[in-house]
Amino acid sequence: MALSSTSTTNSLLPNRSLVQNQPLLPSPLKNAFFSNNSTKTVRFVQPISAVHSSDSNKIPIVSDKPSKSSPPAATATTAPAPAVTKTEWAVDSWKSKKALQLPEYPNQEELRSVLKTIDEFPPIVFAGEARSLEERLGEAAMGRAFLLQGGDCAESFKEFNANNIRDTFRILLQMGAVLMFGGQMPVIKVGRMAGQFAKPRSDSFEEKDGVKLPSYRGDNVNGDAFDVKSRTPDPQRLIRAYCQSAATLNLLRAFATGGYAAMQRINQWNLDFTEHSEQGDRYRELASRVDEALGFMTAAGLTMDHPIMKTTEFWTSHECLLLPYEQSLTRRDSTSGLYYDCSAHFLWVGERTRQLDGAHVEFLRGIANPLGIKVSDKMDPSALVKLIEILNPQNKAGRITIITRMGAENMRVKLPHLIRAVRRAGQIVTWVSDPMHGNTIKAPCGLKTRPFDSIRAEVRAFFDVHDQEGSHPGGVHLEMTGQNVTECIGGSRTVTFDDLSSRYHTHCDPRLNASQSLELSFIIAERLRKRRLGSQSV
């Protein structure tokens, strides 16, 4: 299971721990990444042969087992798409498709060597953990749980330290407690952490003062400094990204199971927030009710020492973008015989790479992890239905999460058509709102920012549409940090355009700071509570 109450902080058993501490150094390798021997299957990895879900007799039915053929696919456009020949899936069958957003490495031999090294590394996460997450997401699809997914726009090597990881984890815990009380349902906490490095770019090159260099694609590909050395894609960065991901998740496991996530501690943090918030009166009532509930539970014997009160479940996620790296961390699970991408529990395909006949969709259709699909107002309803058919032909609950990113007004117009199309097709999905990407603007100073009011408006539109359609709002997906940055304007502790430059630290897109994130969780909790009380009164 993931970072759960059933695991221990110092266990090194395969079904509980991440990786053992060992040197992770590249070695001389011979196997070619883009060789003609692309039909080689991933070997069984003996160290994870005993890794499975808590109930080893529960063999999940997931989208595609290895050696099964893909359904006919089409391009993700509104025009009729050409038929795609059925092919068997293999861990490297994506190479036969058009792959967008991949960097061009000048040193292919070094890339092959690094990928072979990573292929021999231990998995970062395990199959049983991903299956547990899929089960939880299946509950969210039915309206019986709520997904809270958040973290950095892009993780960086420079800002990698324990305090930053702790602060983001802490704010997710605080938000989760607020949402859980408001909705009276489990909250599935998934971090955009321990692997969210790579970023898609609208242009492969950037030009300044007549100098043209490759675009910055994330710290696992190249550096953000505008010089030839930094911008040249470096395969060794993949090794560092792996090590940082493993170390991050190792620390998260310790936080989740070592008492840091104790419910009483979390609620005290929330009470402190309401004391210092300009709109504290609005949120103090909810925080006080949580405090009263905890007092009742303690009186009933459910004290701080009980595992359920001092531990939590937590999963990791990132965009499936850098396919060579993802392939190198794909392992076959001995319990089910299915392939899992062991770089994260949950992966999503982005707006720029979700072509029905593209390499990213080809790779994702064959792995058994729960998957997300980023959807903008440009998504045609029929194309979405086809994409879901490809990725989840057996229609398994929890397998597919639709992450909508449209802006408030577009949400009210476009989302109903997507919901109706998916419902007509009988497909089971978890609907999630990403209120960040559709609300990016440029400030007068030239920096990108996102108005808190626009983010809040999109969340409200998301709930309004689901109320109107009789469907379930299954969660939120946020770019956020536990730091006191000034990247998004607005919020109760008002950040203005003039404030942006004071603590603008993002390596990519603007993030909600700790206060703004928690404020948004109180707003969502109020909406969940109204929805719950409304359903009870019917």
Swiss-Prot record:
Regulation of this protein's activity per its record: Activation by tryptophan (a hysteretic factor).
UniProt entry tagged with the keyword Transit peptide: yes
Domain of life: Eukaryota
Any GO MF annotation of the entry: 3-deoxy-7-phosphoheptulonate synthase activity
One annotated Gene Ontology cellular component of this protein: chloroplast
Sequence positions bearing Blocked amino end (Thr): 75
Pathway: Metabolic intermediate biosynthesis; chorismate biosynthesis; chorismate from D-erythrose 4-phosphate and phosphoenolpyruvate: step 1/7
Catalytic reaction equation(s): D-erythrose 4-phosphate + phosphoenolpyruvate + H2O = 7-phospho-2-dehydro-3-deoxy-D-arabino-heptonate + phosphate
InterPro entries referenced in this protein's UniProt entry, alphabetically: Aldolase_TIM (IPR013785), DAHP_synth_2 (IPR002480)
Compartment annotation: Plastid, Chloroplast
Induction summary: By the herbicide glyphosate and wounding.
EC identifiers of the protein: 2.5.1.54
Location of the transit peptide in the chain: 1-74
Bias (Low complexity): 68-82
NCBIfam families: DAHP_synth_II
Family: Belongs to the class-II DAHP synthase family.
Stated name of the protein: Phospho-2-dehydro-3-deoxyheptonate aldolase 1, chloroplastic
Native source species: Solanum tuberosum (Potato)
Name of the gene encoding the protein in the UniProt record: SHKA
